[in-house]
Regions:
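Catalytic or ion-coupling anion/metal-binding cores of large enzyme and transporter domains
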Residues: 1-182, 187-266
Length: 269
């Protein structure tokens, strides 16, 4: 599991997701009347799910940690939010100010990250942009950037990393993800330049770029959107996908769900 000592199989045998949902419903932390993709409510799906191992699925009154597993950060670098997984982060980096080392794409990252001449040290903040829902259609799991080889050789095992991409739920590191709005649509991440100072303050839920507002506006005026596909499904996707803070759904589907879809069984006995 992302946090704790148990495996995914242990979670399943302990009752699984619906057991967690039922506990949250009983604690009145979820609205059980909301509909889900199968046309049933959250409460209906949870049904009579039980917890069979309280060491794996802890009760709400005795959580694994005092704080939640996800921290939502906001600031001038992420006006609509970004997320970080504190349980996977390094405690010493949860309050950190560092110099930005910027990669404009995943290709740029792979081309330069292990260059011995790259100006980067353990205090730097790695920034990977144009990897969000529009910049890298599908929002690939590339946010947990591997550290530079020369720093790994010196024993560095974690650094602050910021991206509009996502990462696997079982990945580790002090990684800020899902920055919204993303760089490809002109979000502030697009305006970060090499050497800019960035502040990460997890306790304060802040993510700030220490650049004068006037300078940021000058950069905004000079910014140009990166090229994107103009045909086929990819073009449709880029045109209609919403940002990470809105679930990366299609804009034309918002408000159009809520009922079960009738279907004929293909199996007749």
């Amino acid at each position: 599991m992302p946090s704790g000592q148990f495996l995914m199989e242990d979670f399943a045998y302990a009752g699984g997701l619906q057991a967690v949902v039922r506990q949250l419903l009983e604690a009145r932390l979820l609205d059980g009347d909301l509909l889900t993709v199968n046309g049933k409510s959250i409460k209906e799906n949870a049904g009579s799910a039980e917890v069979f191992n309280a060491d794996v699925i802890r009760p709400v009154t005795a959580p694994l940690t005092a704080n939640g597993g996800i921290a939502v950060l906001r600031g001038n670098l992420a006006p609509n939010g970004a997320v970080l997984k504190p349980s996977a982060a390094t405690a010493e980096l949860m309050q950190h100010t560092g110099r930005a080392v910027v990669f404009d794409s995943i290709d740029d990252f792979h081309a330069r990250v292990d260059d011995p001449t790259l100006e980067i040290d353990a205090s730097s903040i790695m920034v990977l942009r144009n990897c969000g829902p529009c910049g890298y259609p599908g929002m690939a799991e590339v946010g947990n950037m591997p550290l530079p080889a020369k720093l790994l050789a010196r024993g560095v095992r974690d650094m602050v990393r910021i991206s509009d991409a996502r990462m696997s739920g079982t990945a580790y590191g002090t990684v800020v993800l899902h920055v919204a709005p993303e760089a490809a649509v002109g979000g502030p991440l697009a305006l970060v330049q090499q050497g800019d100072q960035i502040v990460l303050d997890v306790a304060g839920r802040r993510l700030e770029l220490l650049v004068d507002p006037g300078e940021l506006e000058r950069r905004r005026q000079a910014w140009r959107a990166p090229p994107s596909s103009r045909q086929g499904y990819q073009a449709l996707y880029v045109k209609h996908v919403l940002q990470a803070d809105r679930g990366c759904d299609f804009d034309f589907l918002v408000g159009c769900r809520g009922a079960a879809v009738p279907a004929l069984s293909l199996i007749h006995i």
